[in-house]
Amino acid sequence: MAASLLLRQGRAGALKTVLLEAGVFRGVAPAVSLSAESGKNEKGLPPNPKKQSPPKKPVSAAPTEPFDNTTYKNLQHHDYSTYTFLDLNLDLSKFRMPQPSSGRESPRH
């Protein structure tokens, strides 16, 4: 039943309940309020209006660039053939390091 109560309170409420029930932080004032209500301080009063910054002017959107896909050449997706993997495998085989062997002959399946 306690778990269902924690789930109904949400993350902030569950964390607050766990911290209060744990008894670890008794007598220590919380540095940060765990209240889910935004726009209010610890006493439930609205924030001081003097500290608010003036509203900023909206930034105008950058002009859109013309769309041109005639120069797009993605060879990775468009040059596949039946032997593409084998060709790349042969090209890269000269860069492979030899693998160590245990000295035993590998099983023949």
From Swiss-Prot:
It is found in: Mitochondrion inner membrane. InterPro entries: NDUFV3. Belongs to the complex I NDUFV3 subunit family. It is a peripheral membrane protein. The modification Phosphoserine is found at residue 106. This is NADH dehydrogenase [ubiquinone] flavoprotein 3, mitochondrial. Its main location: mitochondrion. Keywords: Electron transport, Membrane, Mitochondrion, Mitochondrion inner membrane, Phosphoprotein, Respiratory chain, Transit peptide, Transport. Residues 33-72 are annotated as: Disordered. Accessory subunit of the mitochondrial membrane respiratory chain NADH dehydrogenase (Complex I), that is believed not to be involved in catalysis. Complex I functions in the transfer of electrons from NADH to the respiratory chain. The immediate electron acceptor for the enzyme is believed to be ubiquinone. May be the terminally assembled subunit of Complex I. Residues 1-34 form a transit peptide. Complex I is composed of 45 different subunits. This is a component of the flavoprotein-sulfur (FP) fragment of the enzyme. Pfam families: NDUFV3. GO terms for biological process: mitochondrial ATP synthesis coupled electron transport. It comes from the Eukaryota. One of its GO terms (cellular component) is mitochondrial inner membrane. PANTHER family: NADH DEHYDROGENASE [UBIQUINONE] FLAVOPROTEIN 3, MITOCHONDRIAL, NADH-UBIQUINONE OXIDOREDUCTASE.
